């Protein structure tokens, strides 16, 4: 369901054939650059060329699907370069708090039930885990799908191609998927959208775009309950450092970083205590 405070449209300025297909897929209106200039503020989804080319000539794989909020620059997902790849190389590997929270086994199978922009899922895959990303927003899922496709193109580093092969994307409501499909996995990871207290200049434009599209997760407790009945080893919930744990069953342990806390729900211990 569209929750953005701005109307969302597909921009056909670049790659019009792909834009038309995407508009049909997402059931969103198609708009030209001229029409967009004359309209009220819009949230546009379309292709963007960031100046980096795969060769001597620009071709279709040089374009990234991006979200264009009215007040910020383009927001896209890139597993090949930029922050996600930097985090893979210099983020601390298995010693980083996120990795310590989820690595219940050497290479656990993980469901990231709140995939968002895919940053944490990419970290899991870079550590050798098979990861299923579940994203309920069709628009964010389209951005993820485009990023996965670009990361497997000829010319992309082999190690990155191997990482993204371990990522699978499902566009669905996570609670419904876990309840109806009962997938087998070791770990389920949740990163609920926390209600924004106030807007600041420091708020990342990716986070602003997510907040516009999906708003806060008001069903986090329901999702946690579903996850606890599916995960084989543990459920991990990412929270702001000083935020309370999600209501319901309390976590067995927590791992903290400067601004974040990872609450760990160990399935075996919870069952032994009669809490599951």
From Swiss-Prot:
Keywords for this protein: Cytoplasm, Methyltransferase, rRNA processing, S-adenosyl-L-methionine, Transferase
InterPro entries: 16SrRNA_methylTrfase_J, SAM-dependent_MTases_sf
An example Gene Ontology molecular-function term: rRNA (guanine-N2-)-methyltransferase activity
The keyword Glycoprotein belongs to this UniProt entry's keyword annotation: no
Compartmental location: Cytoplasm
CDD domains for this protein: AdoMet_MTases
Binding site for S-adenosyl-L-methionine: 135-136, 191
Main location as per UniProt: cytoplasm
Highest taxon of source: Bacteria
Catalytic reactions on record: guanosine(1516) in 16S rRNA + S-adenosyl-L-methionine = N(2)-methylguanosine(1516) in 16S rRNA + S-adenosyl-L-homocysteine + H(+)
E.C. number: 2.1.1.242
Disulfide bond annotation, renumbered to this chain: none
GO-annotated cellular components: cytoplasm
PANTHER family given in the database record: RIBOSOMAL RNA SMALL SUBUNIT METHYLTRANSFERASE J (PTHR36112:SF1)
Task performed by this protein: Specifically methylates the guanosine in position 1516 of 16S rRNA.
Record family assignment: Belongs to the methyltransferase superfamily. RsmJ family.
Name of this chain's protein: Ribosomal RNA small subunit methyltransferase J
